[in-house]
């Protein structure tokens, strides 16, 4: 199951997982976006099922989850950012971002975990929960205080979950990308001064592509990472190494 699957990283992760053989359940608020992703997945001979859903609506997500017979992998991806200087953060923006990036991430993970645990052979087959975090869950950045707070919270959530869900053989990790060339980041990079400053902070000298992150997610979803839990896979071109 991939949340926020209509665009950007969620779309790329859904396609990568389908290519790897997963039966992908894709969620987004926008049906037209889901239709486009489903079409791409069909072209790769993959399998998908889509649901229109706002993950900030607890009961709505809960109802959709009841329609899903089996769940082995969660990519907890839905999120957003509204850059503002800390002293000028609007209350409505702080509440919107925290509801989506933290509260909804918690609720989705909790409900999915409960469903995964109920599988009779869970300890044998295992499971994987991957939170889409950020390098900004590791380091600070100007104009991103609320996002910093949210993603540091997601990092803590993942570690606590990893300890508690290990007894069910459910692994929990995060993927922490640098700035990725998604529709959202392209809007930020219209500010050339900001873009150039960000590029100077990436030793590899480029922003990440969606595929860079999607392949990291696919790795953490696969059996090849079966001994990896409670950690972060940082896809940042060296930013946080400095």
Language-model-detected regions and their locations in the chain:
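Substrate-binding pocket helix/loop in short-chain dehydrogenase/reductase
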Residues: 85-86, 90-98, 198
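Residue(s) in the substrate-gating loop at a strand-loop-helix junction
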Residues: 134
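Short, small/polar-rich loop/turn modules that mediate ligand/substrate recognition or access, typified
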Residues: 166-171, 228-230
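Conserved glycine-rich Rossmann-like NAD(P)H-binding loop of the short-chain dehydrogenase/reductase
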Residues: 22-36
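Active-site helix of classical SDR
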Residues: 109, 150, 158
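Conserved glycine-rich cofactor-binding loop
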Residues: 6-8
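Short C-terminal tail/terminal secondary-structure segment
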Residues: 139, 204, 218, 229-242
